[in-house]
UniProtKB/Swiss-Prot annotation:
The active site is at 174, 225 (proton donor), 295. It catalyses: UDP-N-acetyl-alpha-D-muramate + NADP(+) = UDP-N-acetyl-3-O-(1-carboxyvinyl)-alpha-D-glucosamine + NADPH + H(+). GO terms for molecular function: FAD binding; flavin adenine dinucleotide binding; UDP-N-acetylmuramate dehydrogenase activity. Residues 29-196 form the FAD-binding PCMH-type domain. Belongs to the MurB family. GO terms for cellular component: cytosol. The keyword Endoplasmic reticulum does not apply. It comes from Bacillus subtilis (strain 168). Its cofactor is FAD. Keywords: Cell cycle, Cell division, Cell shape, Cell wall biogenesis/degradation, Cytoplasm, FAD, Flavoprotein, NADP, Oxidoreductase, Peptidoglycan synthesis. This is UDP-N-acetylenolpyruvoylglucosamine reductase. Its EC number is 1.3.1.98. The keyword Nucleus does not apply.
């Protein structure tokens, strides 16, 4: 990897770190090392990074702000591209905004609310990046990204980059085309908003923030929701009904506040979290004959 690191630095693509612990880059504070972590300084820098990756034929992975993510203890081989400060541009034109994939969803929602632009109220308090939100069709309070996305600039698994329309994104509940059909990540997005009364937008945002603060354990290291809701049921309710709130394996613990959250109670490993996830799946299956599926992305090791 020395030649890869050297060329990435020569091309001045952004920050380049060798053998970087990914626990430093996830909201759960868990994860082994990346062979190389690159934080690109722009979309053009991403293109340069991909040129180097193709030249040396190395594996690559993209992460955002580290929420909704569990990195395995073995870490990630090859190059990890972290969409962060270099991809947090914001351009507003009327009721339409073009925003970088590394931009904070919370920061974007707050900024737009102050301008009286409606459409992202549901995102108040949601951790993570715009790119990640598009990738998983993040949502809350009956709304999601599919309702406001016009198009997205996508870096595909084969290294090509192109724009996809809302229809081409093939959104459904907490999924998009990027997860399986056409694996890729969102570098930037164009969102359609609507001008409304600023005060009512701000009030709704605050209400959503308060709800999250009072019902979800974001003061503790966690990844966000662990399981998708097996509709019409709610994952958190099933976990609570099964008596699993507070259940702990190693340093990983099911939150006392919300059954669909696993917190790092101190020194948790990814294995602790995986074992706890398996225990929940097995228990819910035995008690209610319902299969639970993870919402959190699990990456690293041989995955």
């Amino acid at each position: 990897m020395e030649k890869v690191i050297q060329e990435l630095k020569e091309r001045e693509v952004g920050k380049v770190l060798a053998n970087e612990p990914l626990a430093n880059h996830t909201t759960m504070k868990i994860g082994g090392p990346a062979d190389v972590l690159v934080i690109p300084s722009s979309v053009d820098a991403v293109k340069d990074i991909m040129d180097v990756i193709k030249k040396y034929d190395v594996k690559w992975t993209v992460i955002g702000r580290g929420s909704n993510l569990l990195v395995l203890d073995e870490g990630i081989r090859g190059v990890v591209i972290k969409l962060g400060a270099g991809l947090d541009h914001l351009e507003l034109e009327g009721e339409q905004v073009t925003v970088g994939g590394g931009y904070s969803v919370v920061r974007l929602a707050t900024s737009l609310s102050k301008k009286g632009l409606s459409g992202l109220e549901f995102a108040a308090g949601i951790p993570g990046s715009v790119g990640g939100a598009v990738y998983m069709n993040a949502g809350a309070h009956g709304s999601d990204m599919s309702e406001i996305l016009v198009k997205a600039h996508i870096l595909f698994e084969d290294g090509t980059i192109e724009w996809l329309t809302n229809e081409q994104m093939d959104f459904s509940y907490r999924t998009s085309v990027l997860q399986k059909k056409r694996p890729g990540v969102c570098l930037e997005a164009v969102l359609q908003l609507e001008q409304k009364d600023k005060e009512s937008i701000v009030q709704q945002m605050q209400s959503n923030k308060d709800y999250r603060k009072n019902t979800q354990p974001y003061s503790s290291p966690c990844a966000g929701s662990i399981f998708r809701n097996p509709l019409p049921n709610h994952a958190g309710n099933l976990v609570e009904k099964a008596g699993l709130k507070g259940y702990q394996i190693g340093g990983a613990k099911i939150s006392e506040m919300h059954g669909n959250f696993i917190v790092n109670a101190g020194g948790a490993s990814a294995k602790d979290v995986l074992d706890l996830i398996d225990h929940v799946k097995k228990t819910i299956r035995e008690k209610y004959e319902i299969d639970m599926h993870t919402e959190v992305e699990i990456i690293g090791g041989n995955r």
